[in-house]
Design a protein with these regions (language model features):
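Bacterial signal peptide processing site
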Residues: 6-9
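C-terminal motif of bacterial Sec signal peptides marking the signal peptidase cleavage site
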Residues: 2-4
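C-terminal low-complexity, charged extensions that often adopt amphipathic alpha-helices
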Residues: 82-124, 155-161
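Non-transmembrane domains of secretory- and envelope-associated proteins
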Residues: 113-163
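An acidic-aromatic
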Residues: 46-97
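A short, Trp-centered hydrophobic/proline-enriched beta-strand micro-motif
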Residues: 12-29
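Short beta-strand segments that buttress and anchor functional surface loops
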Residues: 22-26, 49-52, 119-123
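Hydrophobic/aromatic beta-strand elements that line small-molecule binding cavities or substrate pockets
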Residues: 36-40, 131-133
Length: 163
């Protein structure tokens, strides 16, 4: 007599563009934040995470390309840009464009409240990021538009994010 086992397989959708709401939970040191945000992905080209903690006003924008990460502090009109090697010297585990893209397309099970959690360590700081995705739409975005950097002052990333 043979015993059988069943394997559940989650389907990952093939897409060119992806748009979704993301509820971000951030824990750093003794502080916790819950932030509303949206993520837009142009496959293999650009990822934009827009953080709108109050009244839908964008305060921080992260733009990830295959070779670099850009963080825009919209309130103080400043930005930081770094390649992945520089970012990975500051935090562990290492971050890559592919990893971020796969995170954004993590399978959603409608009946479950699935959260994705990732811990990053930078020096003496621990940052725990929790993501809950909703309202996912595929292939609805127009061509990507990058933020115009001439409106912002370039600064070191640590002046925007306390790493």
């Amino acid at each position: 007599m043979l015993a059988s086992c069943s394997v559940s397989r989650q389907t990952v959708t093939r897409y060119q563009t992806l748009s979704q709401r993301v509820q971000l939970g951030l824990k750093m040191d003794q502080h916790e934040y819950n932030l509303s945000s949206s993520a837009r992905v142009w496959r293999d080209e650009l990822i934009v995470l827009s953080v709108q903690p109050m009244l839908g006003i964008e305060m921080v924008r992260l733009e990830a390309t295959p070779d670099s990460i850009w963080v825009f502090d919209k309130m103080n009109r400043r930005y930081a840009a770094m390649d992945y090697a520089s970012v990975n010297r500051m935090i562990q585990p290492n971050v890559s464009f592919r990893m971020l893209q796969e995170l954004c397309n993590h399978p959603i099970t409608p009946k479950k409240k699935e959260n994705i959690e990732q811990e990053f360590v930078s020096g003496k700081h621990r940052l725990i990021v929790t993501c809950k995705f909703s309202n996912r739409e595929y292939n609805t975005l127009q061509a990507p538009a990058r933020t115009k950097v001439n409106k912002y002052k370039q600064v070191d990333l640590r002046t925007i994010l306390p790493l």
